[in-house]
Swiss-Prot record:
Protein's gene: gyrB
The name this protein goes by in its record: DNA gyrase subunit B
Catalytic reaction annotation: ATP-dependent breakage, passage and rejoining of double-stranded DNA
Stimuli inducing this protein: Expressed in mid-log phase; not induced by novobiocin.
Protein's organism: Haloferax lucentense (strain DSM 14919 / JCM 9276 / NCIMB 13854 / Aa 2.2) (Haloferax alicantei)
Miscellaneous remark of the record: Novobiocin inhibits DNA gyrase activity by binding to GyrB and blocking access of ATP to its binding site on this subunit. The mutations in GyrB causing novobiocin-resistance probably produce a gyrase that binds novobiocin less avidly. Few gyrases are as efficient as E.coli at forming negative supercoils. Not all organisms have 2 type II topoisomerases; in organisms with a single type II topoisomerase this enzyme also has to decatenate newly replicated chromosomes.
């Protein structure tokens, strides 16, 4: 797309060597599981996005190949191929083999650059068994190849001249090293979600993904940028005003973009990004937005006498944000990331900039669009009234529990340990399974809470109504950290919550209802990795005095074939947890030595919000469509 040659070997700065990467890969890409594997693709794509941010690229193609490799192609300026003075090697080779070598550290070649770990393609090279690069620049096509990070020097060559009108650009194709990664199989959906997000955040850049293994493909191009992102997130919701509110500004080299739309939902959905990174832990940009939003809404509401119902109180932030979908995107030349997972923006100056932009532009928008302002404020007033009712309900609950002999729910069989780090709570479907679990557990560190039937669907109710539900109240009390905005993970009584439901449709529904409650009202538990789903076996196979458990039909068939010579003594199918006696339940599902647990994680909060809304919200159409689209992906079928 661009022939701009400001970006050459002279702009490539080198900060440190590559030796440690293969020894400690997790330090550089976070982990060596599926998340780390996909991070490799994001590192390469981030380079192409940086070219786009600098105005030199508007098309990026990602392809998953049948041989397990992945390639990323862009139409940017092409990685420099001229000789690097310090190393006396081609700049391309330096970028690929030296950690932190790149044109992103002097703010001249790139004003803004993404990439959470910022480790660049050299780490991708170090963690690949093989990597190939094709560069189109300086009037020619160049290729180079690397094996386990080592340059195959004789393979750096100028292949041919560029054709007249042919685009410049870079293609990187790599094969992840299966000696390092737990899995080397890329997941189309995981990549699709991230690439869609990047296309929303970088309007006008076309990003395509194709999968040779399945012939699946997707192309994303959003001229409306984060405006369209908000529309996408609200697809299954009812908006309170037609147009998405959008404003942007630049101050001190920091770009701010904000889009929002209020809906009639009870859950808000606010997503903040810094340099294209999903800042899941929030940060100064989010704080600035929330503070200014609450102030602007209260200023407008007070000046138009709209808060008479609240007995002189102002609206709180949580009232204003109820049902609000918003995307905040800042681009910063020198972002500082903090927090446990380095996904919290720490630059203090950003708060003031976002506050002032929001105060000024949203205030003006409200004055010019009184109908929209009224719709948003009426919803917030309704939320404030419900919050006050919920407070009364909570106080009532607290008073009630203080009168009871113990503040813990009667049906909780607690564990002896008082150390949350070694304690686990099994949340069990049904009293009969609860009885078996209580008898089969190790009471030193395992607590059991049986739940009767299906709990309330919290997606459709406010907190005051939720707190009226006995089963939910018992669960909140047992976990111990409170609920909603006041939830405090430090006060949680267990660091493992294990959802134990039957392996049928009802069990899956109950598990989804529980996850909705935990995600919406105790989300830190999921973010800290405290929530698990038990995986009880579906089948038990006996043969000549030996017992084998199978999680699914495929495993059952393999056991029958390989362990029982095709002729088992007995095959038992567990229809429900209640069918297992205490010993079987301990043996298959509760014993830490041999049980299988599935940790519940949230990779992408925007996708999770949308998913809970589709599955548990009011709109039937999107749910039907989702079931239709994913019927073939189901992991089990209940007959």
């Amino acid at each position: 797309m661009s022939q701009d040659n400001e970006y050459g070997a002279g702009q490539i700065q080198v900060l440190e060597g590559l030796e440690a990467v293969r020894k400690r890969p997790a330090m550089y890409i976070g982990s060596t599981d599926s998340r780390g594997l996909h991070h490799l693709v994001y590192e390469v794509v981030d380079n192409s996005i940086d070219e786009a941010l600098a105005g030199h690229c508007d098309a990026i193609e990602v392809a998953l190949h049948e041989d397990g490799s992945v390639s990323v192609t862009d139409n940017g300026r092409g990685i420099p191929v001229d000789t690097h003075e310090q190393y006396d090697r081609p700049a391309l080779e330096v970028i690929m083999t030296v950690l932190h070598a790149g044109g992103k550290f002097d703010n001249k070649s790139y004003q803004v650059s993404g990439g959470l770990h910022g480790v660049g393609v050299s780490v991708v090279n170090a963690l690949s068994s093989e990597l190939e690069v094709e560069v189109k620049r300086d009037g020619a096509v160049w290729t180079h190849r690397f094996e386990v990070g080592e340059p195959q020097v004789e393979e750096f060559e100028r292949v041919r001249d560029l054709e007249p009108g042919e685009d410049t650009g870079t293609t990187i194709r790599f094969w992840p090293d299966d000696g390092i990664f737990e899995t080397t199989e890329f997941d189309f959906k995981t990549l699709e979600n991230r690439l869609r997000e990047l296309a929303f955040l970088n309007s006008g850049v076309e990003i395509s993904l194709s999968d040779e293994r399945t012939d699946e493909s997707s192309t994303f191009l959003f001229e409306g940028g984060i405006r369209e992102f908000v529309e996408y997130l609200n697809e299954t919701k009812t908006a309170l005003h037609d147009d998405v509110i959008y404003y942007d500004d630049e101050s001190e080299g920091i770009e701010v973009e904000i889009a929002m739309q209020a809906t009639d939902e009870l859950q808000g959905s606010i997503h903040a990004f810094a340099n294209n990174i999903n800042t899941r832990e929030g940060g100064t940009h989010l704080t600035g937005f929330k503070t200014a939003l609450t102030r602007v809404v209260n200023d407008y509401a007070n000046s138009h006498d709209m808060l008479d119902d609240l007995d002189g109180d102002n609206l709180r932030g949580e009232d204003v944000r109820e049902g609000l979908t918003a995307v905040i995107s800042v681009k910063h030349p020198d972002p500082q990331f903090e927090g446990q997972t380095k996904t919290k923006l720490g630059n203090s100056e950003v708060r003031g900039i976002v506050e002032s932009v929001t105060h000024q532009q949203l205030g003006t928008f409200f004055e010019e669009n009184p109908d929209t302002a009224t719709a948003i404020i009426s919803k917030a007033v309704e939320a404030a009234r419900a919050r006050k009712a919920a407070k009364q309900a909570e106080e009532l609950t607290r008073r009630k529990s203080a009168l009871e002999s113990t503040s813990l729910p009667g049906k909780l069989a607690d564990c002896q340990s008082r150390d949350p780090s070694e304690s686990e709570l099994f949340i069990v479907e049904g009293d009969s399974a609860g009885g078996s679990a209580k008898q089969g557990r190790d009471r030193k560190f395992q607590a059991i809470l049986p739940l009767k039937g299906k709990i309330l669907n919290v997606e459709k109710h406010r907190l005051d109504r939720i707190l009226e539900n006995d089963e939910i109240r018992a669960l909140i009390t047992a976990i111990g950290g409170g609920v909603g905005d006041e939830f405090d993970i430090e006060k949680a009584r267990y660091q493992r919550l294990i959802l134990m439901t039957d392996a049928d449709v009802d069990g899956a529904h109950i598990r989804t209802l529980l996850l909705t409650l935990l995600y919406r009202h105790m989300r830190p538990l999921i973010e800290a990795g405290y929530v698990y789903a038990a995986q009880p076996p579906l089948y038990r196979v006996r043969y000549r005095g030996n017992t084998y458990d199978a999680m699914d039909e495929a495993e059952r068939d393999r056991i029958i074939e390989e362990e029982c010579n095709g002729n088992p003594t007995q095959v038992q199918r567990f229809k429900g947890l209640g069918e297992m006696n205490p010993d079987q339940l301990w043996d298959t599902t509760m014993n830490p030595e041999n049980r299988v647990l599935k940790r519940i994680t949230v990779e992408d909060a925007a996708a999770a919000d949308r998913m809970f809304n589709i599955l548990m919200g009011d709109a039937v159409g999107p749910r039907k469509q989702f079931i239709k689209d994913h019927a073939n992906d189901a992991e089990w079928v209940d007959i």
